[in-house]
């Protein structure tokens, strides 16, 4: 690392600590020429994600938009804000692990619905009603009956997505 005082490229690391829950590293360095001490930070460069919408358009992934949708589904449910933020982080991590930085919106929606179904069925139904564009009470009843019949989270979600695309 180049010394900001003398420009020398040689230094030694005096101290190194993980910060931000292990997502960054803070290093205290000392220039081997002039002895000046300085701090550097290292972070993993995250892949920029994009969302391919149902109409074919592509837009930059918006964490806040995902957060708002999940918060609305979980409104007045026994889930803390910290749990919601962890939930959103998990969805983003799963999306970042995909092969392409362009994620179809239905993939994100499916991930959200699968996770919601395991933590809060009411929130799952709320989210599904908006995401799958329910038209009437019959749509709600169909999802509720599927929830009762299917134990695994992934069983009814693909059926919902197929029904919503008709």
From Swiss-Prot:
Protein family per UniProt: Belongs to the NrdR family.
Pfam family, one: ATP-cone
ZnF endpoints (unnamed): 3-34
Necessary cofactors: Zn(2+)
InterPro entries hit by this protein: ATP-cone_dom, NrdR-like_N, RNR_NrdR-like
Entry GO MF terms: ATP binding; DNA binding; zinc ion binding
Protein name: Transcriptional repressor NrdR
UniProt domain ATP-cone: residue ranges: 49-139
Cofactor note: Binds 1 zinc ion.
Annotated PROSITE patterns: ATP_CONE
HAMAP family (UniProt xref): NrdR
One example of a Gene Ontology biological process annotation: negative regulation of DNA-templated transcription
Cited function: Negatively regulates transcription of bacterial ribonucleotide reductase nrd genes and operons by binding to NrdR-boxes.
Keywords: ATP-binding, DNA-binding, Metal-binding, Nucleotide-binding, Repressor, Transcription, Transcription regulation, Zinc, Zinc-finger
């Amino acid at each position: 690392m180049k010394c900001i005082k003398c420009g020398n490229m040689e230094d030694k690391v005096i101290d190194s600590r993980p910060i931000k829950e292990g997502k960054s590293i803070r290093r205290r360095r000392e220039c081997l020429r002039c002895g000046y001490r300085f701090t550097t930070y290292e972070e993993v460069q995250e892949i920029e994600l994009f969302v391919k919408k149902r109409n074919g358009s592509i837009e930059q992934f918006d964490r806040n938009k995902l957060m708002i949708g999940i918060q609305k589904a979980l409104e007045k449910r026994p889930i803390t804000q910290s749990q919601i933020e962890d939930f959103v982080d998990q969805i983003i991590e799963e999306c970042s692990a995909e092969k392409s930085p362009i994620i179809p919106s239905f993939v994100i929606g499916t991930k959200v619905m699968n996770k919601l179904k395991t933590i809060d069925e009411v929130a799952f139904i709320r989210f599904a009603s908006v995401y799958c564009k329910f038209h009437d009470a019959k749509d709600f009843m169909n999802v509720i009956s599927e929830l009762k019949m299917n134990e695994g989270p992934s069983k009814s979600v693909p059926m919902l997505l197929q029904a919503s695309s008709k």
